[in-house]
Amino acid sequence: VIRDAGEEKQWASLYPDVPYIRQQVVEGIPASVCCVANGHAARAIAVNEQLLRGDGESAFGFCGSVTPFDHPMAGQMIALAEKIAASSGCMGTLGIDFVLGRDTPYVIEVNPRFQGTVDTVEMACGCSLFQYHVNACAGTLPEAPDMQEYAARRILFADRDMTLAADLKELAPIVSDIPWPGTFFEKEQAIVSVSGTGATRKEALSTLDKNISSVRQYVH
């Protein structure tokens, strides 16, 4: 994050021949809407709370999600996301990222692909985003699914250069994106994703914390 003209000049001096885009930082809560589209219409599947790393050079890096996201602006987000997705010409699943300001949701970007929230969306609604994707590409959109529970996921990152000795597949289904035993990770590299579910957001996050504690015993 560049805070003044001096910092921008210093940053530009590091990459003198590389063009860059300067964007204003929007303060608020990071969120997203998962949609599926058929090229001219779209359906919102889920509203997600996004978890960011929060410090250092990776402060704005994605590190997990909670689905569903119960927020007073959820309805506005859904309406905007469906309009954007329908107008994009995309077919299949796509995500629209938001930052929720004090009074309004700000659209940040459109991701025309399977999103990082796919795990929590599928766990929360009991649906298959892949099947929704296939059907949408054939022209058929689903009804908006009912949320069956809350789902939370967090990515664990290496706190130093390390080699993972453990076979984490034994911890499934609370882990995903499972690396091979013996994989080398540089500091700050993503190692594995950990999930938790519950009847409420608080319960899902509590389960996630317990599962992370269990997984950390094998990640050292």
What are these regions (language model features)?
Residues 1-7, 200:
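Alpha-helix N-cap recognition
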Residues 16, 27-31, 89-94, 150:
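Short, basic and Ser/Thr-rich N-terminal targeting/leader segments
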Residues 24-83, 87, 111-135, 145-146:
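ATP-dependent carboxylate/phosphate-activation module, predominantly the ATP-grasp catalytic core
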Residues 32-34, 95-99, 184:
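Short, surface-exposed charged micro-motifs
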Residues 37-42, 100-104, 158-160, 199:
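Short acidic-glycine loop/turn motifs at beta-strand connectors
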Residues 90-102, 145:
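A short glycine-rich, hydrophobically flanked beta-strand micro-motif that places a catalytic Asp/Glu
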Residues 131-220:
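Peripheral (often C-terminal) accessory segments that flank ATP-dependent C-N-forming ligase machineries
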